[in-house]
Amino acid sequence: MKFLFDLFPIILFFATYKIYGIYSATAVAIVATFAQIGWVWLRHRKVDNMLWVSLAIIIVFGGATLILQDETFIKWKPTVLYWLFAVILFLAHSFFGKNLIRAMMKDQIKLPEPVWVRLNISWSVFFGAMGALNLYVAYNYSTDTWVNFKLFGFMGLMFVFIILQALLLGKYMEKNDNQKI
């Protein structure tokens, strides 16, 4: 359910684009992200930092799209977000000795340290590649294709990447008496 909730602004962006176009879809994405944060705040009295970052990026790039009536800015939004994720993962590990992937997942799975390092690097590279792929699609295909790719392509790639990660990690996961594998 959380997965669908996380996709809420993207799904509304997609649906609005199909009916009303890129500028209406951009406005809806901004409002939907505000609504998403409001809902999280009302339910948990705490909002994840990544949601705030996503809101800031959609306000800046979506706002520029609406004010300047130039869809280029909204097309850059996923790239900026993905590259930001990639850089944060890389810098946190390289300069601060923090493995953010381990910090997020350590309660779910137990892995040897070298595997956590590889996992962190693979996610950083994946996000970097996703950002580059977004720009490729944005600049080489129609806006219709980009919007479709933004929802279905990125979701599909993310799904495949997660499945591949799970398959690769399966051999390293430590069994625990309470955990069924």
Swiss-Prot record:
Q: Where does the record place a coiled coil?
A: none
Superkingdom per UniProt: Bacteria
Name the family the entry cites: Belongs to the YciB family.
Protein name per UniProt: Inner membrane-spanning protein YciB
For this UniProt record, the keywords arranged alphabetically read as follows: Cell inner membrane, Cell membrane, Membrane, Transmembrane, Transmembrane helix
- Which Gene Ontology terms of cellular component type are present? plasma membrane
The record's subcellular location field reads: Cell inner membrane
Q: What does this protein do?
A: Plays a role in cell envelope biogenesis, maintenance of cell envelope integrity and membrane homeostasis.
Which Pfam families did the record assign?
IspA
Q: Where is the signal peptide?
A: none
How does it sit in the bilayer? Multi-pass membrane protein
Q: Mind telling me which residue stretches traverse the membrane in this protein?
A: 24-44, 49-69, 81-101, 119-139, 149-169
Q: What is its main location?
A: membrane
